Amino acid sequence: MLERRQFLEMAALAALAQAGPLSAADEFDAPGSDAARQALALKQGRVTSAALVETALARLERVNDRLNACRFLYADAARAQAAAKRTGPVAGLPTFTKDLAEEKGRAFTEGARAFATRTGATDDGAAAAIAASGLISLGRSTTPEFGLLPTTEPLLGGPTRNPWNPAHSSGGSSGGAGALVAAGVVPFAHASDGGGSIRIPASCNGLVGLKPSRGRMAGEEGDKGVTAVGVNGCVSRSVRDTAAWLAALESRKGPYPPVGLVTGPSRRSLRVGLRGAGHAGEPHSDVRAVFESATDLLKRLGHRPVEAPMPYDAPAAIDAFLNIWGAGAARSVQGVQAWLKRAPGSDDLEPSTFAFAERGAKLGEAQLGKAVATLEGAVSAYLAQFDSFDVLMTPVLGAPPPEIGWLAPTLDFDTLLERVLAYVAYTPIENAAGAPAIALPLGMSAKGLPIGIQFTAPPGGERRLLELAYAIERARPWHGLRPDVWAA
């Protein structure tokens, strides 16, 4: 027998199927509008891909001066793609690609002034997967330099601003994607995550952000080990849009069976581990309040929350992660030097990049090996905790989105690092573990800024997370919320 909600959803879809043509703007602004609705309208012939692209371009023009979320636009190429026949569940829908992914012939700055004029030589795995899905990328969304910081305030182009309050950060490193989706320019956008960079902008902008398992997505099948921290995904305004992106772009040759399209919640009662404190201690009081509210919601949904103590030496694990992060920054600086054919200076790279790179460059082979071993031990303990519960729940961040400048790359590095560690107090371990994690917008700060809660499962457990996310979304819907900067 159909549940009442399922019956109403089916009735709504049937009514939609019988409706006459709508303007493309309706597919962006109507209640509940998202990528899934746009895809249905395309399939039914009630709207064209060209109309969706033109509408998204117009919406970008309305808000980008206030948000600074897209610096490179490829409108003519998008129009040409929209005119071509494209097949697939997300084909023909507009999106943006983060400026850390390499797209052939398009700007490839990685947020660095040194690469201000560089263009991509080829499509990397993420860009190739986006193209193969039939999605139409309108342009490049902003990112901090090399994706190193949890805010998008590069000296190349200036800060990207939060649609809920433009004086505040949109997060990072997928801050441009987060701002564009939250402001209603497109329903979902490419994002990537090496330490929280999908989940952080999702939390800052009131969005859904799924970090997939290591090796899950097309082009990432060979990634292995705790140092392979980066994955690709999206930020979106609805769970079903995130599920659709995953189904369309996941690998069929990865280490886990394909998830496929997850369409709704499970009836299963889950054991949920609760960890409110991060490696830096207790979060901001507004974050703690949202966390407690989410705990109550889980109980009402029939789940079984249990306290989950920290199973590993968090300070040692974070220090090891920072050493590996620094080694990556050092490689980025070496790449800049090869590109410039000279040593980069202060006009090329930001102070924080040099500082991270200096930390990495100082590591000898033995020290780096010790960092890897420390992180492997932490990951082993982290994964073992899932013997005691099905899902782990934490905040996404230690505080609400800060004001622009609080995490600026020009700050004294000791001050910046102290602030970063207090802010990014929950998300890096999932990258080292290769575990999937989803951020959901479950509350607001006293100042009206979004606060996200994170749910994590063992590697390969995306279906479990999406089913739980559907149930939470139905119980506490966020679709009607609109930020101060909205593209209509």
Tell me what each language-model feature is:
Residues P402-Y423:
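Short, surface-exposed loop/helix-turn segments at secondary-structure junctions
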Residues T122-L246, N431-G443, K447-G452:
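Short glycine/serine-rich loop segments
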Residues A56, T242, V272, L298, ...:
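Residue-level signal for inorganic ion chemistry
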Residues A51-E54, A83, S285-M310, V333-P344, ...:
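Acyltransferase
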Residues A24-F28, V208-T295, Y312, R476-A488:
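A short helix-breaking turn/cap at a secondary-structure junction
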Residues A11, L16, D26-G194, S293-D296, ...:
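Gly/Ser-rich catalytic/binding loops embedded in alpha/beta enzyme cores
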Residues M1-A14:
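N-terminal secretory signal peptides and thylakoid transit peptides that target proteins
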Residues V90-R113, S266-R275, I324-L383, P395-A399, ...:
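Short helix-loop capping/hinge segments that flank enzyme active sites or metal/cofactor-binding pockets
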